[in-house]
Structure formats: C-alpha cells, structure tokens
Amino acid sequence: MILRRSVILALGLTPLLTRKVFSQTAVKARHVGLLSSGAPFTDASDIVVGLKAGFSMRGYVVGSSLLIERRAAEAYLDRLPELVDDLKSEAELIITNSYAAARVVKDHANIPVVAITGADPVATGLIVSLAHPGGNITGVGEVAAELSAKRLEVFKDAFPNLRKIAMLWNADDLGMTMRYKSAEAAAIRP
C-alpha cells in the first residue's frame, strides 16, 4: 500500500518538479581578464588567489559562474594591444599589473579597468585626478617616484663612501622612468 501511494505521489509531482527545473534560467558566467606586461599569472599568483577568494565570498564559482582569462606580454610590450583586443572580446573587466598594460587597456578598450601599478596614476596620465579619475579606470597606485628617491637617500646615509649605484629599469614604462629620474636626482644631491 505504501509503495502504491509513493508511486502515485511521485507520478503526480513529476510535472510540477520538471516544470520548476526546466524553467530555471542558466546563470550567466562573468568574465574577468587578467593582463600582465611581464610573466603570466599562475594559480599561485597573489592576484589570482585573492580574486578567487574574493569572488567566491560573493557566491561566484570559478569555472562556472566566473571565468578568469589570463594573458601575458612576457616583457614584449608591443604585444599588449593584441592581448587587450583578445581579452576585451569576452571580458567585462580587465585587471592589469603595470602602468604599460593599464595604458594600453585604457586606450584600446571601453570596459572597466582595474590598474595595480607602481606608478603615480595622475602623474603618468592614467587618470585626471584622484578625486575625479574620469574614464573607465580605477585601481591602486603608489608614489613610487618619491619612494625611490627616499630609498636612495637612506642607502647613501647607510653607506656614505659609496660612489656608484646601478639601477635597472624599463625605459618603455613611464612609471619606471619616473622612479629612475627621481632616484637620479636624489643621487646628485649631496
């Protein structure tokens, strides 16, 4: 008797359950692009780990409701426009890790950009001002040029007899060039 009631109940509920299941709309996956001007982002990269953790706290599941596309120029900055074009076809947001990448995304894509740079975003022209950045870009910058000069001053104080210091930088990266010029000016000061 119990088996018969269970079968009848199951058959009676089947149309209701299937209608409910089939009427659910699929959740659209969100696409985030990561653009590196240097080495590729790996799953162990701080930015990838942080993104996954942050999005998962908001209910996104990487691989289904959140897709992260990664591109890297591997120091070939002339490849950045091509990589941006590739990312912007799918991504709703692009996150960059350098001034060079942020500049190219800003100039070539009309989607939101989060720039994590070691350069002053106002001095490099990425944004108009900190209060009103304008455009499609936001992010984190730093006063690295001033810090470079201060670091050199501390170094000179620690080693007063030192006469030569070498500094490596990428002349194609305005942020790095600004840091170099600031350090160079500090080196000349007595």
Roles of regions detected by a PLM:
Residues 1-190:
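Short hydrophobic alpha-helices and adjacent helix-cap/hinge residues
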